[in-house]
Amino acid sequence: MNYATITYYAIANGPCGRTSVFVSGCRHRCPGCFNSVAWDFAYGQPFDKATRNQVFASCQPDYIAGLSLLGGEPFEPENQRELLPFVRNFKALYPNKTVWCYSGYTWEQLTGKEPCAARCEVTDELLQLLDVLVDGEFVQAKHDISLRFRGSSNQRLLDVPRTLAAGQPVWWEDEKVFATHTMEGN
């Protein structure tokens, strides 16, 4: 698996400071995608052991809340197979830090309730390791810059442990100060 870029101390892809890994490879090709350069699976650099260790080290400080996986598309089967052991190791190293993942696939597709070519032998385990899944393709016509941690209004921020326990999608709950935020100056 290749990665397009890694952003350290990011604040746009989940709460607090995070390390964001943008994997390469995406078959969605959403019009208006902010990272279309990462559609190509061959783009970027190999996500090798040295890079993984650098990501792990970057998450060590207490002020880093966790890891965010973006793309490209983390849930392309080729990427899932590489990300699973990486996320497993991350959770073992940092059990109190969160893992957020952005996917153009929906929860229903990834869990097999709807047809999905991305579902493979590691999908369920990878989902279980996530804290939040931001699901759904970016839709240019639903683009809204006032949305926190997502680009278009069709995308959902799902609390994965609560979703798994409930057997249906459960939205992630933002801190109250941010949950009532609007861009209208209220």
Predicted segments — roles?
Residues 6-8, 53-55, 119-121:
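A generic local structural motif
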Residues 86-91, 143-186:
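P-loop/Walker A phosphate-binding loop and immediately adjacent motor/lid segment at beta-alpha junctions
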Residues 54-57, 82-92, 125:
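Alpha-helical scaffolding segments of alpha/beta enzyme cores, especially the outer helices
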Residues 1-22, 27, 31, 35-43, ...:
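N-terminal [4Fe-4S]-dependent radical SAM core
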Residues 35-50, 62-77, 91-118, 127-141, ...:
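Core AdoMet radical
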